Regions:
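FAD-site-proximal beta/loop scaffold in flavoenzymes
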Residues: 1-12, 105-108, 113-187
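Glycine-rich dinucleotide-binding loop and its adjacent helix/turn
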Residues: 1-31, 39-45
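Short secondary-structure boundary/capping segments
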Residues: 15, 53-54, 150
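Rossmann-like dinucleotide-binding cores of NAD(P)H-dependent redox enzymes
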Residues: 19-23, 38-97
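Active-site flanking residues adjacent to catalytic metal/cofactor-binding acidic residues
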Residues: 26, 33, 64, 161-162
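Glycine-rich nucleotide phosphate-binding loop and flanking beta-alpha elements
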Residues: 32, 70, 126-127
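Hydrophobic alpha-helical segments that mediate membrane insertion or helix-helix packing
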Residues: 35-39, 186
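Short loop/edge segments at beta-strand edges and connector loops
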Residues: 95-97, 103, 162
C-alpha cells in the first residue's frame, strides 16, 4: 500500500499515476470488507498530508462482490449498515459484479475494466479436500454441514470446525469461516 503511494508520488504522468492509486478488493465477505475499509482509512485519513504530487483523495478503493450484497452471510441490516459505512468513507462498493480477469495492471469485471496495480483477492476459498473423503453432507461451498456440537451428521465422533464447517446459529444463519469463530469452536 505504501509502495503504491510512493510510486504515485514519483510518477509524473497523471494517467499512469492513477493505476497506482486504484485499489481493488475482490470479495465482499468479512475479509474483503475489513480490507477495503482499512485501505480507505489509510488512503483518505492517515496519508492525507503526506504527498506533494497528488492528493490522497485521488485514490480509489473498489470493493467488488459477485452477489447482491456485501457480507452475504450476515443479516440484511448488518450488510446495509456496512455498505453505508464504506460508501460514506469513500469506498466504491460494487455488488452483482463478477471479476472475469485479473492482469498485471487491470481488473476486468462483467461490467467494466479498472486500471489498477493493487488487487487484493478476498473472494472465497475452497473447503479442505478432506471433507469430500468424509462422505457427509456438504453445502454448495464444499463445507461439511455440522450439528450444534460441531459433529458431522453421519458420525457423532467426527468434528469439523472453522472454514471447513457449515455451522448454523440459533437463527439458522451460517457462521462465517473466520478465525474468531474457529477459535470458539475449537474451545468448545
Amino acid at each position: 500500500l505504501l509502495r503504491a503511494f510512493e510510486k504515485a508520488e514519483n510518477e509524473k504522468n497523471i494517467e499512469k499515476r492513477s493505476k497506482y492509486l486504484n485499489f481493488v478488493v475482490v470479495g465482499g465477505g468479512p475479509t474483503g470488507v475489513e480490507m477495503a475499509g482499512s485501505i480507505a482509512e489509510i488512503a483518505y485519513r492517515n496519508m492525507k498530508e503526506e504527498f506533494r504530487n497528488f492528493k490522497s483523495s485521488d485514490a480509489n478503493v473498489y470493493l467488488i462482490e459477485a452477489t447482491d450484497k456485501i457480507l452475504p452471510m450476515y443479516s440484511d441490516r448488518l450488510s446495509t449498515k456496512a455498505e453505508k459505512y464504506l460508501t460514506d468513507f469513500g469506498v466504491k462498493v460494487r455488488t452483482n459484479e463478477k471479476v472475469i480477469k485479473i492482469e498485471n495492471d487491470s481488473v476486468t469485471t462483467d461490467k467494466e475494466s479498472i486500471q489498477a496495480d493493487n488487487v487484493i483477492w478476498a473472494a472465497g476459498n475452497e473447503a479442505s479436500p478432506i471433507i469430500k473423503k468424509l462422505n457427509t453432507k456438504t453445502d454448495n461451498e464444499g463445507r461439511a454441514i455440522v450439528d450444534p456440537d460441531c459433529s458431522i451428521k453421519d458420525d457423532g465422533n467426527v468434528f469439523v470446525i472453522g472454514d471447513a464447517a457449515n455451522y448454523k446459529d440459533k437463527n439458522n444463519i451460517t457462521l462465517p469461516g473466520i478465525a474468531p469463530v474457529a477459535i470458539q469452536q475449537g474451545k468448545y
